[in-house]
Protein backbone atom coordinates (compact mmCIF):
# COMPACT_ATOMS: atom_id res chain seq x y z
CA UNK A 1 0.00 0.00 0.00
CA UNK A 2 1.54 3.35 -0.98
CA UNK A 3 2.07 6.05 1.59
CA UNK A 4 2.68 9.77 1.44
CA UNK A 5 5.78 9.96 3.62
CA UNK A 6 8.94 11.46 2.20
CA UNK A 7 11.46 8.61 2.40
CA UNK A 8 9.75 5.33 3.32
CA UNK A 9 10.22 2.19 1.25
CA UNK A 10 6.72 2.64 -0.21
CA UNK A 11 6.60 6.42 -0.60
CA UNK A 12 5.69 7.77 -3.99
CA UNK A 13 4.94 4.43 -5.64
CA UNK A 14 1.60 2.94 -6.56
CA UNK A 15 2.81 -0.59 -7.28
CA UNK A 16 2.84 -3.43 -4.79
CA UNK A 17 6.14 -3.89 -3.04
CA UNK A 18 7.77 -6.79 -1.26
CA UNK A 19 10.38 -7.13 1.44
CA UNK A 20 13.12 -9.75 1.36
CA UNK A 21 15.19 -10.12 4.51
CA UNK A 22 18.44 -11.96 5.12
CA UNK A 23 20.08 -12.39 8.49
CA UNK A 24 23.13 -14.16 9.81
CA UNK A 25 24.76 -14.57 13.18
CA UNK A 26 27.90 -16.13 11.73
CA UNK A 27 31.13 -14.26 12.38
CA UNK A 28 32.95 -12.90 10.49
CA UNK A 29 30.28 -11.43 8.25
CA UNK A 30 32.41 -10.40 5.28
CA UNK A 31 30.86 -12.96 2.93
CA UNK A 32 27.36 -12.06 4.10
CA UNK A 33 28.02 -8.36 3.49
CA UNK A 34 29.42 -9.14 0.04
CA UNK A 35 26.26 -11.10 -0.86
CA UNK A 36 23.97 -8.44 0.64
CA UNK A 37 25.80 -5.71 -1.29
CA UNK A 38 25.52 -7.68 -4.54
CA UNK A 39 21.79 -8.25 -3.98
CA UNK A 40 21.13 -4.63 -3.02
CA UNK A 41 22.93 -3.29 -6.08
CA UNK A 42 21.36 -5.88 -8.40
CA UNK A 43 17.85 -5.17 -7.13
CA UNK A 44 18.48 -1.44 -7.52
CA UNK A 45 19.60 -1.88 -11.14
CA UNK A 46 16.82 -4.31 -12.06
CA UNK A 47 13.86 -3.00 -10.08
CA UNK A 48 14.82 0.35 -8.52
CA UNK A 49 14.55 -1.47 -5.18
CA UNK A 50 14.82 0.49 -1.95
CA UNK A 51 16.87 -0.88 0.89
CA UNK A 52 15.52 -0.79 4.45
CA UNK A 53 17.13 2.14 6.29
CA UNK A 54 17.80 0.00 9.37
CA UNK A 55 19.51 -2.88 7.57
CA UNK A 56 22.86 -3.25 5.80
CA UNK A 57 22.80 -0.25 3.48
CA UNK A 58 25.57 -0.33 0.86
CA UNK A 59 23.91 2.18 -1.45
CA UNK A 60 25.19 5.72 -1.91
CA UNK A 61 23.54 9.12 -1.77
CA UNK A 62 23.41 8.96 -5.59
CA UNK A 63 21.18 5.87 -5.30
CA UNK A 64 19.05 7.63 -2.69
CA UNK A 65 18.65 10.65 -4.96
CA UNK A 66 17.36 8.41 -7.75
CA UNK A 67 15.07 6.31 -5.57
CA UNK A 68 13.33 8.94 -3.47
CA UNK A 69 11.62 11.72 -5.45
CA UNK A 70 10.96 13.73 -2.27
CA UNK A 71 14.50 13.53 -0.86
CA UNK A 72 15.12 17.25 -1.38
CA UNK A 73 11.98 18.08 0.59
CA UNK A 74 13.15 15.74 3.35
CA UNK A 75 16.56 17.44 3.46
CA UNK A 76 14.87 20.85 3.61
CA UNK A 77 12.69 19.76 6.54
CA UNK A 78 15.70 18.33 8.36
CA UNK A 79 17.70 21.51 7.80
CA UNK A 80 14.84 23.69 8.98
CA UNK A 81 14.20 21.77 12.21
CA UNK A 82 17.79 20.70 12.88
CA UNK A 83 19.92 23.47 11.33
CA UNK A 84 23.04 22.45 13.28
CA UNK A 85 22.73 18.75 12.45
CA UNK A 86 22.47 17.72 16.10
CA UNK A 87 20.36 14.67 15.20
CA UNK A 88 22.54 13.59 12.27
CA UNK A 89 25.28 11.02 12.30
CA UNK A 90 27.79 9.84 9.70
CA UNK A 91 25.26 7.40 8.19
CA UNK A 92 22.68 10.14 7.67
CA UNK A 93 25.24 12.57 6.29
CA UNK A 94 26.70 9.98 3.92
CA UNK A 95 23.53 8.26 2.69
CA UNK A 96 21.24 11.28 2.59
CA UNK A 97 23.85 13.62 1.19
CA UNK A 98 23.98 16.30 3.87
Predicted segment positions?
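C-terminal, helix-dominated tail/subdomain
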Residues: 18-22, 70, 74, 80
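Short amphipathic alpha-helical patches
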Residues: 63-70, 98
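Substrate-recognition/cap regions that form aromatic- and gly/pro-loop-enriched pockets
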Residues: 1-59, 63-66
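Intrinsic disorder at enzyme termini
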Residues: 74-98
Amino acid sequence: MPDDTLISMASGVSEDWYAISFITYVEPRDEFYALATFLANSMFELFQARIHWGKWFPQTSDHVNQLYPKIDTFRDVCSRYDPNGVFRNSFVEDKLGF
